[in-house]
Structure formats: C-alpha cells, structure tokens
Amino acid sequence: MSDSEEDEEEEEASEVILSSVVQKKKKKNLRFGEEVERRDGLVLLAQSTPMVRSRSQGTTRRVTPTPLVDVEKPLPNGDLYIGSFSGGFPHGSGKYLWKDGCMYEGDWKRGKASGKGKFSWPSGATYEGEFKSGRMEGFGTFTGADGDTYRGTWVADRKHGHGQKRYANGDFYEGTWRRNLQDGRGRYVWRNGNQYTGEWRSGVISGKGLLVWPNGNRYEGLWENGIPKGNGVFTWSDGSSCVGAWNESNIMRSFFNGVEKNDLIVGNRKRSSVDSGAGSLGGEKVFPRICIWESDGEAGDITCDIIDNVEASMIYRDRISVDRDGFRQFKKNPCWFNGEAKKPGQTISKGHKKYDLMLNLQLGIRYSVGKHASIVRDLKQTDFDPKEKFWTRFPPEGTKTTPPHQSVDFRWKDYCPLVFRRLRELFQVDPAKYMLAICGNDALRELSSPGKSGSFFYLTQDDRFMIKTVKKSEVKVLLRMLPSYYKHVCQYENSLVTRFYGVHCVKPVGGQKTRFIVMGNLFCSEYRIQRRFDLKGSSHGRSTAKPEGEIDETTTLKDLDLNFSFRLQRNWYQELMKQIKRDCEFLEAERIMDYSLLVGVHFRDDNTGEKMGLSPFVLRSGRIDSYQNEKFMRGCRFLEAELQDMDRILAGRKPSIRLGANMPAKAERMARRSDFDQYSSGGASYPSHGEMYEVVLYFGVIDILQDYDITKKIEHAYKSLQADPASISAVDPKLYSKRFRDFISRIFIEEG
C-alpha cells in the first residue's frame, strides 16, 4: 500500500461522526410559582457535537455539518411541524401547530425556540418577541385574551426587568418587575385617575410612595404590605393635612379603606388588577410549557402546556388572594348597595337649603377627629364634665388651625371629645373610616323624621353612620347620663342601646345653633331591609298613617302594624332577654322613657316578596339573592354557623353575627289587629295562616334621650283622659320599662 493510500484511510477514519447518546427524560410540567430548574440533561437533544476526540488517534476532528432541509412533518400525536429541519430536529425558521390550536412560528435553534418568534393560543392570547432555549426570554409583548397587554422584558417565561402593562379595565402600570410581580420602583394609574408612584415589593406597595386622588387628596410616606405604615402625610385638596407615624391599627389604614368606593376600587373586580404573588392555584394551573423538540426515533414532539385564556387571566392578572393585606382591601363597603333598591333620603347637593350646614358639619368633624387623634391618656373624671366643651371658629379664609373653605363663617362646638373618641374605639369605629364616611367627597342624604320630634336625620352614603339634629334638652340628658352610659356599654358589649359617636354644635355667624349627635346606623347591612318596625309596647296612636298600598321598604311601621313574631334559637333568645333586662334597668335608673326597639327584617326566601307585595329581594351588593339557589338551607333551623358558611360563599368573608345584627331567625305571620288586646292579655297573638319565613334580623334600642320631665308628665295626664293610661307612651320610667320588657318577651319566642 502506498503512502498516499494510507493517508486517505486515516483521513476517512478521522471523519467518523460519534453520535451522542439520546436519553429520553420524562416531561416535567412546571406549575405557576415553582422555581424553574434548568439542568443539563433535563431534555437531551439528538445533536451533532462540533468537535470530538478520536479515542484511537487521540486527535481532534471536525464533524461534518448536517444540511438544512424544508419539511412538512405530521406527527403521530396529531401535531404538525412545517419548516427547516436539521439533524433530526427543527433548526432555522419553522412553524409548529399543536392539535389543540396552539401555534409557534419563528426561529429555532437545535430543536429549541430561540430568536424572534410568535406564540398564539386558541383563546386569542399571543406573545410576540424574543425566545431563548424554548422560553419567552428577552423583549416581547404579551396580549391576553381579555385585552391585558404587557410590553417589556422577560426571563424564563416571566415578566422580569422593566415593562409596562395596560389592563383591559383601563388601569396602567409601568416600572420594574421581578418574577411576574411589580418589584422596585413603578407607577400605577387607575382608570378613575388615582395614581401611585413609588416602591413595590413582591407585587404589593411597600416602601416610599405617593398616592394621589383626582380630587387633589394625597398621601406621601411609607407603606408596608399595601397600607401606610411609618411616617407619612395625608393632605386634603383644601390644604389641610394630617401628619404622623402611622401603623395598621390607627387612623391612616382607614384613610384608604374608607375611600374605596370612588377612589381605589378597580373596576367591578373582587381582586385588583395589580399583579401579585404566585400563590398556589390548587394544582389546576400550569406554567407555559417549554418549546423544545424531543426526538424519539422517527417521531418528534414538543410539550405544549401553554396557558389558555382562563389561565392567562389568572397567571397574568388575578393571582391575589382577597384575604391578604394591601390594595385588595379596597373593596366595596358591605353597607353599599348598587342594585335597584330605593335608597331613602335626598342627597344634599349644592343649592339644597341644608348644604352649608352639611359643609360646616363635615369641616368640624374632620377638625375634631384630627385634633384629638394624637392625645393618648386615660380618661379623667373631668372629661365627662358637661362643661367640657370647646368652641372653634371657622372663617372662610382659614386660620392657623382650620382650613380655608367655601362655606359661611361659623363656630363649631365639641362636647366631651375625649370621651366620645374612647367610645368610638370601644365600638370599633376606626377614626378615619368615621371621618371619611362623613367628610368624604360623597354628600350626606337627608331623611325626613319618622317621629313627632321634628328632628332631621342625615345618613352617610355608605349607610354606616346616622346624624340626628337634637334639642338642647336632649344634649343635656346625654351629657348628664354620659358617665353611666360609658360604664354600661363598657360592661356589656352586647348592649342594644344606641351607640353614640359624638355630640356637636354648629352656629353660623348671625344664625341659630344646630345641635346634633352622630350614631351608628342599625340597618347598615349587606342585606336589603324589607320591613322595619318602631316598637314601644304601647298602643295609643301606634300605627302608620299610610294606606296599605303606599307602604314600602322605607316605611317605618309601628306596634299596631306588627304582624310577625320572631323565633330565635334558645341561646340567642336567652341572651336577648338578659340584655333587654340590663338595658331597661339602666334606662330606668336614668329616668329615661319613650324609647323604642327598632327592628329591621330581611326575608331570605325569594318567594316571600311576591306574597307580601315587596320588590324583588336583592342583596345589598346588587346581586339577586343567591339563597334561592341554596335549596338545602330552606326548612332548616338556620344555625349561625350555616349562615356564616353561606355568607362566605356569597361574599367571600365571614359575617359578624352578634346580638341585634345578622341574626338568623324565623318570622311567623300573625294577624294584624286594629286594637291592642293581642298584647295586653299576656299571650301571643293568633296566627292568621301559621306562615313561617326565614329571616335575618337587625334591632336595637333607640330614642333614649327623653327623660320623664314635666312635659311628659303633663302629656300623660292629658292623654289619660282620652285613653287607657296603660296604653300611652308617656308613662313613668319604671312602668315603661316593665311594659317594654313584657312586650319584647311576647314578640320574640324561644325556638323549641
């Protein structure tokens, strides 16, 4: 053999291609929120090695490149690949169509989507941009099926780096992202004009930041987990401000919970548009699958667990649990109602004769709450002194301590402010919720007085608080009994007597004084109140003057109009009787009479409305009463635990059931009598049909500021000439208390 022939044989041997062993690995679906592991050999591709070492020769040889060919390759599983192929896998430009409708079209490199490309989902969602090693990585734009759009940088299928997201509801975020969450500095603009600029951590506002409302209100300071915490300043549009070191339990948390209706609620969603943590999705959602070809003999396959439209909306928008802190707390107040129910009262807008009075009241309460918020000490006996009152002047141009305003010059008086601040704390009324419900952008509603006192009633738009104008004599009674009242409500947390939150007085320059008290609204409820009764236990004049056809849900009915008795569980019935006895003894000791039990009834059976001529029963959230779909609840005893379970289903939260609020009961239809013998005999009235209704009750003792003075004594003497002395309201407090308790024990019945 010649030397040239030997050289040719060696050259041929050195050009032998040594193929790598292809080991097929099990596909690994990565769920949202898990760490993405990229390890050598996770998916081993059949590919040529550019440089190999010959074992026999010990020298490095170059591998002959595999040529590119264009193919249309149907796969056994129904998928289809069209494009360039090299070495048994996609390489170059190509299109892969999955049988479920997903499609990738773009660049491939050694079996992996790499370079520029576009991925489409059957739902209409798309990603167009850069890919690397089978993943969305680099710069790209994701458009969700619902219209959400993210444009920015990606790392391993996640938003990471700088990017901007436009939400389908009109919201917008631009800033830094980390693992699909806002993290670092960013700006979020709500569709209603609210804007936050500042720091984020793990998808939640945390750090230094500024939140600005369209009306000019603003908060600038420190945040933690979506709420103000630390040093910060809340500034109103009129220039007044509140400065302090805020924490979760004090005023600033509720500055933001209290303005959710107009300011921070995002669309009609239960969750914010703001992206959040990658919580567990219960094993139902999967991470976008990796676009990598796995060669197995003649066949090939690309794993396609790409998200569909539902998953896209979950993964790219709504992963937040509503129970976590942060902006998810800015949801609708349970007392709001957006349905078709008639809201009582007339909104006090500009031009209303009480408009200036409302502005004065709002300015005064805002000033009072802010002024006394920083005072931290125990109450002293002098704090209860009726002379403990403070006058403050509010000129339109403002002073060092009062803001400028558009109303008339007026003076403002606060009675025993530290005592009422402590009472609000006792009744768990957050200072800022209190302030913003009364002093926020929403106007108050004026109600006509259902009684003969001539008082005016004002209701906040969220229905949480009631404001009543009162006489000077009533203010004196309240201030006189304030020490005993404070002791009583401290001792009995389930007391049914009216919850007082403040006593104030407004006097315009050259005008008359208007005294008013602020109270809790008994009927602040998630449920519509279809019947309301004002019950004293007397009969003389105790019926409504309205004809039957004009009675609606806003009508306050009286004793002779009552045509129900209410059945309570044994433990609730016993607690009610005990508390009524305690409250009546307290009022009797204070020489108070002429009070009432105000009762509100929500009928849970959707058929009750047709029988009683009521409008359709709607939850105060505006939805049709979902209890109609819960047949298993009907006919049972409606134990409080069951009611709580149902409300968790309906509203996503556990309701607060206490004596006088959210109480499950049964209402038995009784015959309405024109006389009062049904109550004077000591027994219950006779049922007309024995009809039973499942209800939720709200009740409390109201009008507790009337003492048995000379006026009431004269009224008693005069009316005794016309009617049975035992049937009139104006009687001695001791007799009134006994009659009231006997009456309550007859209309409320222990469930056997």
UniProtKB/Swiss-Prot annotation:
Transmembrane segments: none annotated. It is an enzyme of class 2 (transferase). Residues 349-748 form the PIPK domain. Its EC number is 2.7.1.68. Induction: By abscisic acid (ABA), drought and salt treatment. Pfam families: MORN, PIP5K. Residues 708-729 are annotated as: Activation loop. SMART domains: MORN, PIPKc. Expressed in the whole plant, preferentially in roots. Strongly expressed in meristematic tissues, namely procambial cell layers. Keywords: ATP-binding, Kinase, Nucleotide-binding, Phosphoprotein, Repeat, Stress response, Transferase. MORN repeats lie at residues 81-103, 104-126, 127-149, 150-172, 173-195, 196-218, 219-241. InterPro entries: MORN (IPR003409), PIno-4-P-5_kinase_pln (IPR017163), PInositol-4-P-4/5-kinase_C_sf (IPR027483), PInositol-4-P-4/5-kinase_core (IPR002498), PInositol-4-P-5-kinase_N (IPR027484), PInositol-4/5-P-5/4-kinase (IPR023610). Phosphorylation inactivates the enzyme. GO terms for cellular component: plasma membrane. It catalyses: a 1,2-diacyl-sn-glycero-3-phospho-(1D-myo-inositol 4-phosphate) + ATP = a 1,2-diacyl-sn-glycero-3-phospho-(1D-myo-inositol-4,5-bisphosphate) + ADP + H(+). One of its GO terms (biological process) is phosphatidylinositol metabolic process. GO terms for molecular function: 1-phosphatidylinositol-4-phosphate 5-kinase activity; actin filament binding; actin monomer binding; ATP binding. It comes from the Eukaryota. Catalyzes the synthesis of phosphatidylinositol 4,5-bisphosphate and phosphatidylinositol 3,4-bisphosphate. PANTHER family: PHOSPHATIDYLINOSITOL 4-PHOSPHATE 5-KINASE 1, PHOSPHATIDYLINOSITOL-4-PHOSPHATE 5-KINASE. This is Phosphatidylinositol 4-phosphate 5-kinase 1.
